[in-house]
Amino acid sequence: MERWADRRDDGLAHLAVTQWWTTKGVFATKLRDSEEELLRICVRKWGRLLVHVFDRGYASGPGLQVLTKCRARFVIRWIKDHVFFTTWGEEKKLWQIGQGKKYLAHKEIRDPSSGERMPCDLWWTAVRHPSSGEQLYVVKARVKQGVMYLSTNDPVKTEAQAWEVFFTYRRRWQIELSFRYAQCELALECPRLWSLEARLKLLAMVMLVYAFLLSLLDPRHHELVEALLRFKCHRTGMRGKQTLAPLYPLRWALSRLWDDYRPRLTCFLPPSNDPLSVCSLIRDLERIHKNWG
């Protein structure tokens, strides 16, 4: 389970906090409790500087109550059949609230993945949810003949505020890309290990690799990464150069580099042809394991 924070100074998403959870064994917990714990960590660290973005899978009354209790700013995409109260106190489904209303804002936007330009229309109003007494605002967005409903607790009274909510939600695709990378490239969709000790070791190794890859994205290593990509993962097309998916080619380049040039770990481990040093290392490791578990 991960939470990503967006830094607007460089426009990139950064990993804020990550945590493993399970429903079995001695570390068993509930998914909602783990999500609430991560939310509280982010709220304590950044307060109202962060806007928490949630997709339709998190749109529910209990989740809204947790966000209200933590006093967090949020943008949630809702299913159109969810029930809200209008400003006149009428109980209606989301699609009925904005039915027949003229859109209040129009703009041509650009798809960041394909570069396609498309028209976008917005309409907004104030609403309330049955599970929360907090004043909410819903933004109805029509893009490519599809309609989405976004709710937020930030005030939406002007066109600029409505566009801010819309573009905040659209940045979720960078976070979805990171989730897909963790599930596919790092093989975290379903680790199949029976013993808890082996599973914890595997997860620790994966997190070590993940942290190493993320550390290479630091601007201080830009020249090193560029040289590595030119050497082992060269791309000539403009689309391949401009695509915002840095971890994929970086891992491919490292894999090909280490296949051709195996890294030497003699600075950490003694050479295998020195049996005395190897036995001394094994003895020290056993002593550390005995004292520290």
Q: What does each model-identified segment do?
A:
Residues 4-293:
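Single, function-defining residue in the core of a domain
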